[in-house]
Amino acid sequence: RRAPPDAARAFVAACALSAAGTSSPPRGDRLDRLTDQLRGAAPMVATLAGARVEADGETLAWRREPGEFRRGQSPVLRLAPGETGVWDGRFEITANQALEIAPLVGRTASLAEPSARALRQVAAPARGALPALETADGLVCPLLQPTPGVTMRALALARLQAACGLVVREP
């Protein structure tokens, strides 16, 4: 809240970019308005460039806005056995078998029980933007339920650190 205006604006843009998994940072009046709103203590919810931000004076949460999937084309990642790919700019996924990852939005009722149970612990606005895939056990979210042959790594924090100049050398 006390950061210089240009630094605050750059940080808000980096947060939106990282949470949404996009490659072009937001600019313009919407970014300026959101930056100004976040300097205040009033509770607020806003979206910017595919990201959803919620603030209540105490906490600040950045998430992917799942409504973007309904408005545009949903990201689908198809992997061959042994292949690694990045889904929605937010998760690196490696698979031992062929699979297809797509957003959970609109499909939560179809989740296999272990994923459905774990999903209840996830903030409602974040649920639809989670990755999901079909397995022999049904629809699962590898972030919520161990999924044999699938490894997943979240990229948002690393992207934010890089956007803020905190990465000295990439691995």
Q: Residue locations for each model-derived region?
A:
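AMP-forming adenylation/ATP pyrophosphatase catalytic core
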Residues: R1-P171
